[in-house]
């Protein structure tokens, strides 16, 4: 895991978030508070603006600072949740600091991603099936781990992870929400995709597409 890749991924994520403004906003207006896109864009923009300052730092410090910035820049529930994801990945690198700059295997990257997702789950006290971003993140993480364990190529892994994220997003359409404003809608939320899940699907696809272009 290299700092340059983390920062390139952050730029790709910001560009993808901006490109999907209408999609995310329409979903949030339907079942959310209507401010999810603004908050996510603010966070991704803030991270993109830290590029030069973060470039000299080691990966674990970059991920930690990204988490801290998201915590302060993003309002609502998304800020602490996304911050915990990046802080979790930073913690993974800190716990494996003897190879923080040598995290090169697909299995190691999958383990880092999974640690971040688990940290987010603990922070949000939520799980799959509750119409949240976890309905995208968990299957993407599980797919990443399984594909890496099977020795698949980076290209194969990225394609499978993208597919898992897409399916996870679609899965939220038929769910009743148990978190946030959407929970108050009960069965009226059925038929709508979760905006947080959509944002995560956009982010995952952006990073995978960045890798596939290399």
Model-based region annotation:
Residues 1-214:
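N-terminal loops that bind phosphate or other acidic moieties
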């Amino acid at each position: 895991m290299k700092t340059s890749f983390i920062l390139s991924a952050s730029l790709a994520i910001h560009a993808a978030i901006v490109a999907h403004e209408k999609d995310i906003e329409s979903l949030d207006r339907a079942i959310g508070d209507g401010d999810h896109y603004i908050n996510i864009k603010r966070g991704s923009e803030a991270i993109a603006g830290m590029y030069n300052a973060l470039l000299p730092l080691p990966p674990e410090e970059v991920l930690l600072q990204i988490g801290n910035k998201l915590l302060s820049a993003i309002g609502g529930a998304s800020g602490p949740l996304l911050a915990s994801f990046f802080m979790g990945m930073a913690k993974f690198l800190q716990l494996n600091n003897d190879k923080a700059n040598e995290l090169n295997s697909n299995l190691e990257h999958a383990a880092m991603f999974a640690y971040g997702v688990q940290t987010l789950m603990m922070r949000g006290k939520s799980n799959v099936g509750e119409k949240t971003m976890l309905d995208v993140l968990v299957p993407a993480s599980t797919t990443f781990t399984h594909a890496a364990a099977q020795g698949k190529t980076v290209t194969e892994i990225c394609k499978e992870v993208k597919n898992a994220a897409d399916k996870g997003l679609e899965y939220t359409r038929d769910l009743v929400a148990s978190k946030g404003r959407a929970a108050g809608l009960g069965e009226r939320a059925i038929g709508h995709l979760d905006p947080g899940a959509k944002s995560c699907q956009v982010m995952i696809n952006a990073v995978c597409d960045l890798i596939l272009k290399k």
